[in-house]
Amino acid sequence: MKKAYRYLWFLSLIVVVVLSACGKNGNETSNTSNKTGKSDAKGGTLTVGIAEPPEGNFQSIFTGSTGDSNVIDFFNDSLIDVGDDLKIKPKILSWEKDKNDDLKYTFKVKKGIQWQDGNPFTINDWVFTLETLADPDYDGPRYSGVAVIQGAEEKRNGQADRISGIKKIDDYTAEITFKEHKANNLLELWTSAPISEKVFKDIPVKDMAKSDAVRKNPIGIGPYKVKRIVDGESVELVKNKDYWRGEPNIDNINLRVVEQTSMTQALENGDIDMATITAPIAKEIKDSGSENLQLLQAPSTSYAIVGFVLNDYDKKAQKIGKERPKYQDKKLRQAMAYAINRKEWIDAFYYGYGKPLNGLIPSAHWSGAKEGDVKEYKYDVDKAKQLLDEGGYKDKDGDGFREDPQGKPFVVNLKHYAGSNPTFEPRTAAL
């Protein structure tokens, strides 16, 4: 029996789950030897289900949504790659540290790469992207990608017309000087999908995010070109025959918005060939015992946090502001860490697809802390109570609730981002 393979990708705290299914149409072809083998098939259309509707910010420097990123990933390319060890490595962009100044790097972009409008991609496009991020009128979420460069802050504050730490050498080479010595300068630097200088140079920065070049006719240097956008419903893409890595095998990619609860049915019906799913859907598939569905797992660097708001945040400047006094007490933070049963939360919200972390870098990452490297806060109610007592957080009026050291009611407010799982709120209350 010939099988058509469909896949579901699931991103949890530390795993990616892939689902494959037998197709119902015997005329469809692919590799028949095994469910995860490679296929020599070319042409055709791949329909991908996405749960989050795109917001229309189809350039990476303006987007903050998964829906938009799902689209951008098909038509634009990052300038760097990440190896199996999760370390960055050259792709379109390569770099070399200056022998006499370790804050200075020389960057080169590959020659022969074209934008999807036929114009050549050069270092000018990347430099233009960086200058845009530092512009005072830029209000997107990516300023941090240029803040590490010398002179970016001065341009951001209107004290300079350009970033002093960027020097163009030729059309394919530029020199960048970082502001200070930091281990993650290269990681922080904006090397994701660039924008075209030719397309955007005559659009005021304050108007870019709402322009047709972002919302209706986006172009990139990736394997597919945007053909048609139906707001909130679908995006159609066609292959870029001039893609710098070679012509893609699949002719067309159709991205379709599908409710998470309908993903499994849509896959089994053949309405979609691939989809992004959440933990509850992964559990549903696993529990179904269907012979047509298979979940494959791999480490991921995705994580979810319960954090303390220690400072105000200046959204425009994208900087941390003054301290908030409420959680500055270390013993209070430690007590709350001991009081939270993280394993119970993972089982309740993510159905076991994950594990507790003891830092902001997941253990799957090459720089993540290994077991025993940092202090682990295991669930311990007695220890939490002891630390609260030591910090002066006691029930001083006998009402059964603790007050702060000044005798005022102590209230903890939890805020959660909007998600695709409607059961999060009632289950949080139950916990």
Walk through the language-model features, giving the residues of each.
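C-terminal motif of bacterial Sec signal peptides marking the signal peptidase cleavage site
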Residues: 18-21
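N-terminal lobe/hinge region of extracytoplasmic solute-binding protein
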Residues: 49-100, 219
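Aromatic- and charge-enriched surface segment that lines or borders ligand/interaction sites
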Residues: 94-142, 175, 266, 326-327
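Surface-exposed binding/hinge segments that line
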Residues: 144-202
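Gly/Pro-rich hinge or "lid" segments in bacterial periplasmic/extracellular proteins
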Residues: 189-248, 252, 381-382, 386
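Ligand-site clamp/hinge motif
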Residues: 207-215, 240-287
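A bilobed periplasmic-binding-protein/Venus flytrap-type ligand-binding module shared by bacterial periplasmic
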Residues: 238-241, 303-331, 348
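Append "and occasionally in soluble cytosolic enzymes with long acidic Gly/Pro-rich linkers
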Residues: 326-430
